[in-house]
From Swiss-Prot:
Subcellular location: Cytoplasm
Catalyzed reactions: glycyl-tRNA(Ala) + H2O = tRNA(Ala) + glycine + H(+); a D-aminoacyl-tRNA + H2O = a tRNA + a D-alpha-amino acid + H(+)
PANTHER family membership: D-AMINOACYL-TRNA DEACYLASE 1, D-TYROSYL-TRNA TYR DEACYLASE
GO terms (BP aspect): D-amino acid catabolic process
Superkingdom classification of source: Bacteria
Alphabetical list of Pfam families matching this protein: Tyr_Deacylase
Gene name, Swiss-Prot/TrEMBL: dtd
Enzyme Commission number: 3.1.1.96
Main enzyme class: hydrolase
Signal sequence extent: none
Protein name per the record: D-aminoacyl-tRNA deacylase
Length: 143
């Protein structure tokens, strides 16, 4: 599982012009782009949620758990793109939707159980993600 985390001042995801998830302008939040590969499972989703919740990338070395920062979770299979050959990425390392969707849901649910204010995009949809990156701070997590 890979999660590309961006510290944001605000973010939102829309599908067909409708906002489906949002971090409203405030102090700080986290946008989590989540990619799933073939050997990921529920235990890995739980560990990744704990890692993100405790990651100290907010102001004053605080974590989302320390300050209750909101988290916007968006599925992103392209995190497993391979560009080693040719000019067109391959997606063989990305898990198929039937495997990935429940694990992205499990990741978001685990964050919620930890106390996070979580919003999500729509799995498999053509989404538009807008954000104001704060810092910028962008970190790639991988388990």
């Amino acid at each position: 599982m890979r999660v590309l985390v961006q510290r944001v001042a605000s973010a939102r995801v829309t599908v067909a012009g409708e906002t489906v998830g949002e971090i409203r302008p405030q102090s700080q939040g986290l946008l989590a782009l989540v990619g799933v590969t073939h050997d990921d499972d529920d235990a890995k989703a739980q560990r990744m949620a704990e890692k993100l919740w405790q990651l100290r990338i907010l102001d004053d070395e605080k974590s989302a758990g320390d300050i209750g920062a909101p988290i916007l979770v968006v599925s992103q299979f392209t995190l497993y793109g391979n560009t080693a050959k040719g000019r067109r990425p391959t997606w063989n390392a990305a898990a198929p939707g039937a495997v990935a969707e429940p694990l992205v849901d499990a990741f978001a649910a685990a964050l919620g159980r930890l106390g996070a204010d979580v919003q999500t995009g729509v799995f498999g949809a053509d989404m538009r993600v807008e954000l104001v990156n704060d810092g910028p701070v962008t970190v790639l997590l991988e388990l």
